[in-house]
Amino acid sequence: MTGRLALLLGASLVASSLFWVQRCAAAESGGGPIVRIAELEIDPGQLEAYKLALKEEIETSIRVEPGVLTLYAVSVKEHPEQIRLFETYRDASAYESHLQSPHFKTYKDRTRQMVKLLRLVETEPILLGSKSR
């Protein structure tokens, strides 16, 4: 191995180590990303109204809240009334801010009678990756 290659390899190892130390420290301090999964069952007779309210809430949250990183809504195949939300927040503070936002409170009030079942799943992020569109 040449000296130059060894130096490059060493620098890469140091940079990788620093990256992982920072990631671990952020996770331990609670400063890492928060990922939530919500499982909902919507009253089939109100499904279209629910989708409209959800669309408005997601679009507003993404536009005005810098700590809201992703909000994805999907339905279970062949069961459109079963909705799954995948939410990623910059950190716990961003999640709490989202819960207190006027648009989220409006969404909750507006959809309260539409939601038959809500189950929140706490997660522990392992690896989060995405690609720019």
Where are these regions (language model features)?
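Glycine-rich beta-strand-turn "strand-cap" elements at beta-sheet edges
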Residues: R4-L9, S16-I34, Y72-E81, K108-R133
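Mature N-terminal segment immediately following signal peptide/propeptide cleavage
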Residues: I34-K51
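Short hydrophobic/aromatic beta-strand micro-patches
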Residues: E39-E41, V74, F86-T88
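Acidic/polar helix N-cap motif
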Residues: D43-Q46, H79, D91
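Short amphipathic alpha-helical segments
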Residues: Q46-V68, H103-T106
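Short amphipathic alpha-helices within nucleic acid-binding modules
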Residues: E48, L52, R90-Q100
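Short, flexible helix/strand-to-coil boundary loops that buttress conserved ligand/catalytic motifs
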Residues: L54, H98-L99, K108-T111
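Short, glycine- and small/hydrophobic-rich beta-strand elements in well-ordered beta-sheets
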Residues: E59-R84
